[in-house]
Amino acid sequence: MALYIMLSRTNTGMGKVIRRYTGAQYNHVSLTLDPELKSFVSFARFVEDVPLVGGYIREPAERFLYLEGPVPVRIFRLDLPEEKEQALHALFARAGNRDSELMYDSLSALVSRWHIPGCHTCLSFASHVLGKRFHSLQELEKHLAPHQIFRGDLRKLVCDSGNRCDPYFRHRGLLRGSWDTVQHFSKLVARLTRMHNCKHIALD
């Protein structure tokens, strides 16, 4: 069994902003145990039209393929010992529960370097799984380079099924999306405020 790590250049407005700010070629990292690359896990937005509200999610390939144009990716393969495989199966099985206490760390993604308990960005989650801290996607990319198995357009590996049933495609609209964003940041700030007193929500 192997762990597959995918760096992607997403065709979203937020993805473009991140790449311009960081100077990186890619702006997102996703993980999977599926050799067919049809479903991933990551920390990212819940729905397409609310970019700063998210958590620990499942990412069907359609999330990357639904927009027109190529989807540049780099994919890496890491062989896993049996005990690590079992641990990752259990960890990945927890993805997709929107009621979970695990949140997307929008504050760190935007401005801060603090680690807020129970919160991750896609990069910090990959760091957590790999057991090594990476400060940028470029640093992660360099570390994984010897394990690359593919570089190019994701469409050459995975076909868009046309399925749009994933919650990602259920738009919230401006008013509800704005309210979701206010609530999300309020929770993050509250956690940050009591960070030294609260119990960490462990991922492992």
Task: Pin down the residues of each PLM region.
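Cysteine-nucleophile amide-bond enzymes
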Residues: 1-204
